[in-house]
């Protein structure tokens, strides 16, 4: 996969691409990440990327020209692919695991990171394929949001995680929150690991994990259960918990 990031603050990404799993993914050629300062594509002596909005109003808007030209430039470097051009914006579609899995199937992603009051609307209408938000709050720019999406996508690429099952069993990947985890020692200051996890009976352990995953989702994110395909056993567990309230 190739990931291009367009930002007027490219140095912000050095910490993300130079550490941990993303660094290893780049070194192992599972993904290539290139950060471009789209200010370099702005016309004029001073390379200005923003301007006042027509009709007045507070703040400045990112101009269409530098972003259009920057996207065109990164496309020309990968002419054999048709990239998803992703605009990081609080008005976009809420990012989730399903979207991460969809993006992970692509060959080329281009992230546009904004600043100031917003974007010239022609960028939305004629350039991007996706508008993505990481939540109902405002950040200084789109860089942190792009980092979050990029991290979520890269870890799903084949060969990136040491254990291929890790991404499959994570919270949200199954539609439910993940079950509790424990490691050694079995007794830490009187706080004990559930006996069933020490039993060695894999069938019991899997059922316990399934039940605890459902219970955690029921208690913390019941909205996730609205369209979840529950088994008969899971329906029985939910009824027990509901009746005990």
Curated annotation (Swiss-Prot):
S-adenosyl-L-methionine binds at residues 114, 134-139. Its main location: cytoplasm. One of its GO terms (cellular component) is cytosol. GO terms for molecular function: tRNA (guanine(37)-N1)-methyltransferase activity. Its EC number is 2.1.1.228. InterPro entries: Alpha/beta_knot_MTases, tRNA_m1G_MeTrfase_C_sf, tRNA_m1G_MeTrfase_TrmD, tRNA_m1G_MTases_N, tRNA_MeTrfase_TRMD/TRM10. It catalyses: guanosine(37) in tRNA + S-adenosyl-L-methionine = N(1)-methylguanosine(37) in tRNA + S-adenosyl-L-homocysteine + H(+). GO terms for biological process: tRNA N1-guanine methylation. The keyword Nucleotidyltransferase does not apply. Specifically methylates guanosine-37 in various tRNAs. Homodimer. Belongs to the RNA methyltransferase TrmD family. This is tRNA (guanine-N(1)-)-methyltransferase. The lineage of its organism: Bacteria, Bacillati, Bacillota, Bacilli, Bacillales.
């Amino acid at each position: 996969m190739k990931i291009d990031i367009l930002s007027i603050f490219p140095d912000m990404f050095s910490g993300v691409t130079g550490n941990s799993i993303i660094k290893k993914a780049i070194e192992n050629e599972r993904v290539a990440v290139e950060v471009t300062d789209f200010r370099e594509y702005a016309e004029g002596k001073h390379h200005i990327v923003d301007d006042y909005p027509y009709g007045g109003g507070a703040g400045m808007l990112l101009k269409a020209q530098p972003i259009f030209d920057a996207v065109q430039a990164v496309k020309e470097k990968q002419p054999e692919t048709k990239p998803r051009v992703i605009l990081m914006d609080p008005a976009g579609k809420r990012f989730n695991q399903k979207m991460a899995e969809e993006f992970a199937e692509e060959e080329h992603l281009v992230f546009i990171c904004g600043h100031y009051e917003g974007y010239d609307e022609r960028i939305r209408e004629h350039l991007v394929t996706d508008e993505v938000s990481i939540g109902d709050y405002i950040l200084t720019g789109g860089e942190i949001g792009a980092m979050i999406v990029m991290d979520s996508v890269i870890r799903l690429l084949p060969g990136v995680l040491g254990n291929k099952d890790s991404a499959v069993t994570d919270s949200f990947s199954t539609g439910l929150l993940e079950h509790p985890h424990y490691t050694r020692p079995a007794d830490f200051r009187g706080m004990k690991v559930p006996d069933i996890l020490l039993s060695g009976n894999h069938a019991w352990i899997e059922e316990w994990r399934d039940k605890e995953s459902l219970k955690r989702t029921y208690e913390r994110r019941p909205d996730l259960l609205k369209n979840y395909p529950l088994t008969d056993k899971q329906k029985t567990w939910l009824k027990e918990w509901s009746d005990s309230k």
